[in-house]
Amino acid sequence: MNSDTCVVETTPELEITCSPVVARAAVGLVAIKDEMDALGRSAAGSAIVGQIFPDWRGHRTLDPHSFAAQVIPFYWYARSKQSSDSFTPRYLALVPTSIVVGESWRWSPAHLNDREQEKVIEKTFNAFSSSSPERVDSECAQYTHIRPLGIVLAHEGKNRVALFKERQLTHIPAMVWDEGYLAPERLRIFELAGTCLAVLDGRLVERVVALHLVRELMEAYGVEVERRWPEDFAELKQVLEDLDDSSTKFHYLPYATDMDKLRLDAACLNTEVEATLLDIDAVRLPPLKTFLHAGIALVVLLLSVGMCAGRWPNLQLLLATAAGALGMLVTVPVLPFVRCKVRHLKDSERMRQFFDLRHHRTRTQRGTAVDPGS
């Protein structure tokens, strides 16, 4: 195809700026995704893929960007920051087929005969040749290039990626957008008993769904996998409980918990406040009828004190003392004379005190808060 030859000769290849070791790891991850897509074409294979991504509720395979969000720690965060902070220009390039993540969800090469495959390839080159950064043909492949990781994610033209690979075509012509990624020093990955976690800036925490898929890439990028949870982080149990909260399940993006929020919550729960005996969860007071009887007895004692005035001063003093003691016993449970940590209060009082403290501290810290992405 002469037009195809012209396009290949005049269009530059995609510039790979990551290190060679990262590039090799990226090719390995893309190859794994290709194998997963192949498995997804059968019921048994889909079941195997489902064991890796049990919470995925989309198509039988993951689209490229969802795959990246699932396996690359905080890819979704890096992408959201770039999308909100700047506009990235697009350009035409010949993209190495081996680094492109596709998705054969509509059709695969096996669904097409040789002539149909040739038509798809021809259409790809024709759409590419008629496209420019200012105007993109609807059939032109459109890709996202994560430059620091050396991976390309297909946005438009996902199905044809497998065809180019099966035909052993070394490059796919595409319109490309560049994306960045988080600097390796901002990330930490922890492989712990029963779970794997990624931490961004010592603050945000998300689960690493499939560390075995992305370990080589992350280590090549400069993020070592650690096995001990730092003591200066929020308590691991608290982090896992927040990540396991049912309200965070089946979210479109991986859920991340904020350790600053968890530290603030813990500080509020451990704050001592004035409380009554009625507010403390561990205190078990006598039933209400006991206080009613005591109140009646107090009234009787007070009346008796009045009746004894002037006639039996010693008895009056004794009754007054008893009335005072009984009055103290009746009123002590409702007097805020003890200090207690918020976490030890009864539910209603604990929540009231907790939200009051949290609101106050949040307002105090708002002026000095720093965005973890800044």
Regions picked out by a protein language model, each given a short descriptive name:
Residues 285-351:
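Transmembrane alpha-helical hairpins and terminal membrane-anchor modules
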Residues 266-290, 331-374:
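C-terminal membrane-proximal segments flanking the terminal transmembrane helix
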Residues 235, 239-285:
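Cytosolic juxtamembrane N-terminal segments of multi-pass membrane proteins
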Residues 137-191:
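A short, basic-hydrophobic beta/loop patch
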Residues 181-233:
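Charged, amphipathic alpha-helical linkers/stalks
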Residues 7-151:
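Short alpha-helix boundary/capping and kink motifs at helix termini
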Residues 32, 39-42, 59, 127-131, ...:
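Surface-exposed polar/charged interaction patches
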